[in-house]
Amino acid sequence: MRGVFLDKDKIPYDLVTKKLNEWYTSIKNDQVEQAEIIKTEVEKELLNMEENQDALLYYQLLEFRHEIMLSYMKSKEIEDLNNAYETIKEIEKQGQLTGMLEYYFYFFKGMYEFRRKELISAISAYRIAESKLSEVEDEIEKAEFFFKVSYVYYYMKQTYFSMNYANRALKIFREYEEYAVQTVRCQFIVAGNLIDSLEYERALEQFLKSLEISKESNIEHLIAMSHMNIGICYDELKEYKKASQHLILALEIFEKSKHSFLTKTLFTLTYVEAKQQNYNVALIYFRKGRFIADKSDDKEYSAKFKILEGLFFSDGETQLIKNAFSYLASRKMFADVENFSIEVADYFHEQGNLMLSNEYYRMSIEARRKIKKGEIIDENQPDSIGSSDFK
């Protein structure tokens, strides 16, 4: 006898599956280095694993999920993500995915579509994944799903749905001390929704708590995200100096890791400095942020930087602003349209340009109407992701 190795020393697939689960845990915790190490170990074991189709399919799905993680944590090219998606899409078309594997496909597809800012496609994929949650026994996996859905709804400014899913995730994560990281991420969503509800002081309190937990956990990207969110909150409170201080702290960390939130931080910092009329400083951040957005083919932030260019760094080229809003609207990013159109309207009002000011105020009202219409549509669809009972 030679222990557990059977079939001419082939590695039992259940041992490889255990290693795959460890890999997935590292991915969910955004532990890039650990995930890379385990991925390499898994790939070596697969070469000598006893035949098992489900284990191979699970590997391919996790490889896709791994690429999604890298696209956030290391600003990896979206093209790499597209290639990984095409591979698993072909597998799904062949009808090889059932049970948990099918759940993972739609769950990861939702993340992929959200990364591409295909918001409706993301919600559609999550809706199918939710219909298969009965296949999921692990409470932590359910909480992870609730968190991801809450993030999309937060992005779409669907506050009711976002808060409900975030709270469902929090209820589970708080029961496990080892999931402090996930708890912090959920708190980000709750606090972001408080900002959307104009409850800035409560949001700031949440973000400051998140910063404290992130520092205790010594997780740099969460520390940076906390500083970024605190900066955004101070921006809303019109405490621009404090906003700049926290955004700069976030920037220092994101620049080292090349995190995907680097562009967002540079954009916000540009805007905050411009609001303080520190145009020379703002221009430095603007050039850096626009360069990164263009280089990484980040169409969302390329458009947003055009808004700032039209307002502060051009000779009154208002067409830049119109083009940017056209792009955001075409992607159904109505929350961004509403927020920025109000800011632009206020700017033109201060400049005495009442015609443009009124145009953008009207745009904000129309965007708000579309956001509200989206909530009504979801509530009336029985198979909607937002129509389940919240407890």
From Swiss-Prot:
> Could you tell me the EC number(s) of this protein?
3.1.3.-
UniProt cross-references to Gene3D superfamilies, sorted A to Z:
Tetratricopeptide repeat domain
Q: Which InterPro entries match?
A: TPR-like_helical_dom_sf (IPR011990), TPR_rpt (IPR019734)
Which Pfam families does the protein's record reference? RapH_N, TPR_12
Q: Which residues form a coiled coil?
A: none
Record text on activity regulation: Inhibited by PhrI.
- How is this protein induced? Expression is stimulated by conditions of low nutrient availability and high cell density.
Spans of TPR repeats, please give: 62-95, 150-183, 184-217, 224-257, 275-311, 338-371
Q: What is its main location?
A: cytoplasm
Identify the keywords attached in UniProt to this record, alphabetized: Cytoplasm, Hydrolase, Protein phosphatase, Repeat, TPR repeat
Q: Which GO terms describe its cellular component?
A: cytoplasm
Protein task: Activates ICEBs1 gene expression, excision and transfer by inactivating the ICEBs1 repressor protein ImmR. RapI-mediated induction likely results from an increase in the specific activity of the protease ImmA, which mediates proteolysis of ImmR. In addition, is involved in regulation of sporulation. Acts as a phosphatase that specifically dephosphorylates the sporulation initiation phosphotransferase Spo0F and inhibits its activity.
Q: What else is known?
A: Encoded by the mobile genetic element ICEBs1.
Q: Which family does it belong to?
A: Belongs to the Rap family.
What is the protein's given name? Answer: Response regulator aspartate phosphatase I
Organism name: Bacillus subtilis (strain 168)
